[in-house]
Regions:
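A conserved, well-ordered hydrophobic junction motif at loop->secondary-structure transitions
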Residues: 43-79
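Hydrophobic beta-strand-centered segment that forms part of the acyl-chain substrate-binding groove
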Residues: 75-118
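A generic structural signal for short beta-strands and their flanking turns/coil linkers
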Residues: 16, 31, 40-42, 61, ...
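Short acidic/polar alpha-helix capping motifs at helix-coil junctions
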Residues: 14-18, 69-70, 84-85, 96-99
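Non-catalytic linker/capping segments at the edges of enzyme domains
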Residues: 1-56
């Protein structure tokens, strides 16, 4: 059973595993992306800074890919916690951290600047240490990119 809402997954990573540029709580120069488990999906929000401009008014595609990457590994960790009956609201750290094995990104529409971006993740499947997550990145209800990640749970 999925939890209604959770603490931010990245805030539950142990300090020694929380330095990622995109989502690490210990990387003050990074994006500080926060992924939340809400029902049976994950959600994150991000407002891109002007320094991430590609063409005028549009977000650089590398940022889109890196947001999907970090949201995907956070989502994978959340879904493993659910499978292992770890209540994210009852722990200070989680024993689960995932890394990217494969990331596929399809760009569907230009991603606008000046708009909060919403990322969503849905569990596709878990097989052993492999976790597949489907994702979307949208702006104002327009899907700008879709992604699929194969994340690997780091060995204990």
């Amino acid at each position: 059973m999925m939890h209604n809402k959770s603490k931010a997954i990245q805030d539950l990573y142990p300090d020694e595993l929380a330095h990622c540029y995109g989502c690490g709580k210990n990387n003050l120069d990074g994006y500080q992306l926060k992924t939340y488990l809400v029902g049976d999906e994950t959600i994150a929000h991000f407002l891109p800074d002007e320094k991430f401009t590609a063409l005028p008014g549009s977000v650089y595609g590398g940022l889109v890919a890196s947001l999907l990457d970090c949201h995907g590994t956070g989502s994978a960790a959340a879904f493993v916690c659910v499978q292992e009956n770890i209540n994210l609201n009852e722990v200070e750290t989680i024993p689960v951290r995932c890394v990217t094995a494969s990331l596929k990104v399809d760009f569907k529409a230009p991603t606008p600047m000046g708009v909060e971006l919403k990322l969503r993740g849905k569990l596709q499947s878990i097989e052993g240490r492999k976790i597949w997550v489907d994702m979307t990145l949208s702006a104002d209800d327009t899907i700008c990119a879709t992604g699929e990640i194969l994340a690997i749970k780091i060995k204990d």
